[in-house]
């Protein structure tokens, strides 16, 4: 690709140049439920309730209640599109991200004069200040607790060490200057920073950058152990682009933000302050989450007190639907990279590729392509699966297949499971292991082996052919031909 992607705008320009990757509408859309309802049909995919499909990204150019605002959705809701945006073959994205972690380029802080995100500044002390009017954040369903920022790059630092981190969190706009922030239990990344600051009685400065280079959005989804506490994931995005991500000093807090973001929210996580997530809707629901279900509202969530909202001239809001293919891309590609890295270090050359399948939202299920080259490799495929669970503790199921199976083709994977697996010997269960709280089946009500919500029975499906049986499982081999000789306009399906 000749177009260089450095921010959201250049990403959109690239997609505009590729047929079928972007659509627009200037028909007025209500950001409350209607916008997400439209995109569900256009291109959400993932674990969204059917009917849905993987389709183009979409820009809404006439947003009710927000004159002049634009909202873009689905930028990453296609693996092929992510390949365009990161300049990689879709099937090689996991390898590219693995290499980026190893060759990290730390972010740099630039002068405020270069901060495009601060072309317009709104202070919380300004008359009429209201984040709900300044930011066209959608409400995905009629049951949602409120409007959510779903693609905010949350950036904060350890109050003692100064180490910084960036992550994406569930952010609900609660009032004119307050946002609730959901943390997955376990105090990873910013959660650990918040707990330390609160224990010391200090508010935690935090910036939320919205509308950034897609490389940043995907890099921010890495988790321990691949990126341990204090590892700044912006350095992964730097490696992808071959140059450091530029940060700028915030206007009202002692923290940095992404300099070319479309919007930045500046604020502080308050000490001891908590808010009921659905205080404004009273639905008992939060928002649609990546497993495909609407998450329950939390009774008590930490509160961000907003100090300012800054943005570029004519800013573009970016959002996503929680269960969409967009989440699969953001969470799944780092999952693949993490598994590839851990297994390759333990048994070089055996794992050929990994796919974090859409049905698990990019987190719950992975298909591993394993190549057995010598008799002693028999059984090592299951060791690879165990390593995958260590690489991503939230992973619930692993499907193992041979190198002749296309892991990105669900029919091919199911074919392998149907013709190469016997359930009594090829399914390995590991009960009582911590997994993810947003999977509703990870609950004592669903199994006697589960003692606490968030615990699961992890499962390995070994659909690989035993090494000494390979001769009996050869796939039919067809003649290689040039189809275009017979059908000049024919295109091989990718």
Residue spans for each PLM region:
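Extended, highly charged
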Residues: 1-303, 307-494
